[in-house]
Amino acid sequence: MKRTYQPSKLVRKRRHGFMERMSSVGGRRVLMRRRMKGRRVLSA
C-alpha cells in the first residue's frame, strides 16, 4: 500500500504558500489568526 504523504516542495508551496493564502478570504483569515497568535512562520 502506498503511503498517504508523498512530500513535494512544489506542491507544498502551491497549496499552502503565502500567495495561495492571500488569494481567498478564508486564507487571509488564516494569516490574520497566525499573526495574532505571534507565529514566526505564517505559511509554507
Curated annotation (Swiss-Prot):
GO molecular function: structural constituent of ribosome
UniProt GO cellular component terms: ribonucleoprotein complex; ribosome
InterPro entries noted in UniProt: Ribosomal_bL34, Ribosomal_bL34_CS
PROSITE patterns found in the cross-reference section: RIBOSOMAL_L34 (PS00784)
Gene Ontology biological-process entries: translation
Keywords, alphabetical: Ribonucleoprotein, Ribosomal protein
Recorded superkingdom: Bacteria
Family statement: Belongs to the bacterial ribosomal protein bL34 family.
Name of this protein: Large ribosomal subunit protein bL34
Naturally occurring in which organism (per UniProt): Orientia tsutsugamushi (strain Boryong) (Rickettsia tsutsugamushi)
